[in-house]
């Protein structure tokens, strides 16, 4: 795998749109490497021809068009640091953000997800906190590197967790920063994000190129 710091430094020298495309290309190369070399990842991969809802051909739990627009939003808002809740099976969003920003701090409940990614960590670019995002210890750890320019909540999608994560982490974002929730369109028993959006009075805007996913965000005032 390519050394991350020199790659990040090269990407940071590019204009935003080119930087995003290079970072996404590296993400896709990484995904191909993962699928070709790691049987444990292959077991998690779902062919989109079989199940489009639960799959992604780039091994990233995002809709590409939505991710591109979100990355453009972050860079356009001078985002240098971000807190992400949820590393995911493949850590693909975390990986992209680590190439584009000065520092990313991600909270992940599942130690197995952390263990899969731990060999790729560059501590000058990224921090991963392992634990329940709603626990006092984890929140206090996140505060150690606050304030952030943005927060992206994409962890446990139950109503209770999304509401608590929003309440706990929005205050760690600077004024003028971005507070974002993933799966903003996904209505269902396990997905409480749309309900949280409806119940809060923030000036929500939405990045949506799919019926099932979507990213909702507001600018902190």
Task: Map each language-model feature to its residues.
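A short alpha-helical cap/connector motif
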Residues: 1-152, 156-221
